From Swiss-Prot:
Residues 352-436 form the KH-like domain. It comes from Lactiplantibacillus plantarum (strain ATCC BAA-793 / NCIMB 8826 / WCFS1) (Lactobacillus plantarum). Residues 4-167, 175-351 form the EngA-type G domain. The gene is der. GTPase that plays an essential role in the late steps of ribosome biogenesis. Keywords: GTP-binding, Nucleotide-binding, Repeat, Ribosome biogenesis. This is GTPase Der. GTP 2 binds at residues 181-188, 229-233, 294-297. HAMAP family: GTPase_Der (MF_00195). Belongs to the TRAFAC class TrmE-Era-EngA-EngB-Septin-like GTPase superfamily. EngA (Der) GTPase family. Associates with the 50S ribosomal subunit.
Length: 436
């Protein structure tokens, strides 16, 4: 089920990023310890009063070399395009400015719910000036202080009241997948090929955002799929469509609402920095991942080309060593018929549960083969392990001292688990806990 999307909009220097960080708190979706991942804090998962939602910081969307008014106009348009609810942020210090009124006009025409936050109300004496902002036409302005974290509860109460009603859940057994990747790698061609004459299209189901259409279809075996955000992939002609941060933001939403992500690379152009950014998000979100090398028909090949390109991918995406790679051509339909089966396999692995007794046999055999590390005469002791979650499979290992579990030994244990059980296509999370 798609989570509601909340966007923070406003002219520069009103404190959008501060408010973003306050609301996101420690739930910002990018973790700090994955090697090789390019980080960008434009998007976070958050929660208020038990309601989960995705948060967009449009302050992080830079339209390079654009005039000031054009920049804030495009920023507002992006928010309108993506959000279910908009937090319109202004500043008490400057009062109502021409730029504020310009953004207000765009938001007013959008018919999206708008909650007006007046930032930088850092002391009670300033509260009387908040009433000036009624002139913007969005009802009660909410006085807040990003610097001190004041007033955010009332603001978020108003935000969640405007969330759309939930639509029906997917039928049991339905697999949700998305195609992610930078612009022009051929995602739309793959969509059209997958939804061709040999597919039964059940319906186009409107998501919680205005134009995020999720497409249901069944494969030749009768298994059900939902392709997430086909509208976003197919959409053309918008000025900001090919700006990197917009496409990353769209990919993040699709990843968040998927079980499996098909990470599409342009085989003719190779790997770019933006590819690494999008792949990093999917990995850190714990989704099942398939690497799809498209436009393979355009690559000059010999008997070693595929193996060499696969080695190139493994070198560039060390943290995706578990992800299967498939070489396709949307133009010629090469290997596209294999994708539904591969998606089903990865989804099965993503949901795999291992019985504790069997898991511990594997762990103890691994330790017998490669003893645990020691430090200053003290040896790491592993008592037992258990699986605590799926999607992704998550294992807790109970030890005498979690600090002694070196990254390399944790990786060794993970590899032994992978050797014993089929977890291809899914990350594995390992958590060390001290035995009480």
């Amino acid at each position: 089920m798609a989570k509601p999307v909340v966007a923070i909009v406003g002219r520069p220097n009103v404190g959008k990023s501060t408010i973003f960080n306050r609301i996101a708190g420690d739930r910002i979706s990018i973790v700090e310890d994955t090697p090789g991942v390019t980080r960008d804090r434009i998007y976070a998962n958050s929660e208020w009063l038990g309601q989960e939602f995705s948060l967009i910081d449009t302050g992080g969307i830079d339209i390079e070399d654009a005039p000031f008014i054009k920049q804030i106009t495009q920023q507002a348009e992006i928010a309108i395009d993506e959000a279910d609810v908009i937090i319109y942020l202004v500043s008490i210090k400057e009062g109502v400015t021409d730029a504020d009124e310009h953004v207000a006009q765009i938001l007013y025409r959008s018919n999206k719910p708008v909650v007006l936050g007046v930032n930088k109300v850092d002391n009670p004496e300033l509260r009387s000036e908040v009433y000036d902002f009624y002139s913007l036409g969005f009802g009660d302005p909410y006085p807040i202080s990003g610097a001190h974290g004041l007033g955010l509860g009332d603001l978020l109460d108003a935000v969640i009241k405007n969330f759309p009603e939930k639509s029906g859940e997917d039928e049991p057994g339905t697999i949700r997948f998305s195609l992610i990747g930078r612009p022009n790698v051929g995602k739309s061609s793959i969509v059209n090929a997958l939804l061709g004459e040999d597919r039964v299209i059940v319906s186009d189901v409107a998501g919680t955002t205005r134009d995020a259409i999720d497409t249901k279809f069944t494969d030749q075996d009768g298994d059900r799929f939902v392709m997430v955000d086909t509208a976003g992939i197919r959409k053309k002609g918008k000025v900001y469509e090919n700006t990197e941060r917009y496409s990353v933001m769209r990919a993040l939403k699709a990843i968040d609402n998927s079980d499996v992500a098909l990470f599409v690379i342009n085989g003719e152009e190779g790997i770019r920095e933006q590819d690494k950014r999008v792949a990093g998000y999917a990995h850190e979100a714990g989704k099942g991942i398939i690497i799809v090398v498209n436009k393979w028909d355009l690559v000059k090949k010999d008997n070693h080309t595929m193996q060499e390109f696969e080695a190139y991918i493994r070198d560039q995406f060390v943290y995706l060593s578990y992800a299967p790679i498939i070489f396709v051509s949307a133009k010629t339909n090469q290997r596209l018929e294999q994708l539904p089966a591969l998606i089903k396999k990865v989804n099965t692995n993503h949901m795999r549960r291992i019985q504790s007794s069997v898991l511990n046999d594997v762990i103890m055999d691994a330790i017998a083969m490669n003893p645990t590390p020691s430090d200053n005469g003290k040896r790491l002791r592993v008592y037992y392990a258990t699986q605590v979650a799926i999607q992704p499979p998550t294992f807790v290992v109970f030890v005498n001292d979690p600090d002694m579990m070196h990254f390399s030994y944790e990786r060794f244990l993970e590899n032994q688990i992978r050797n014993a059980f089929d977890f291809s296509g899914t990350p594995i999370h390992m958590i060390e806990r001290r035995r009480k």
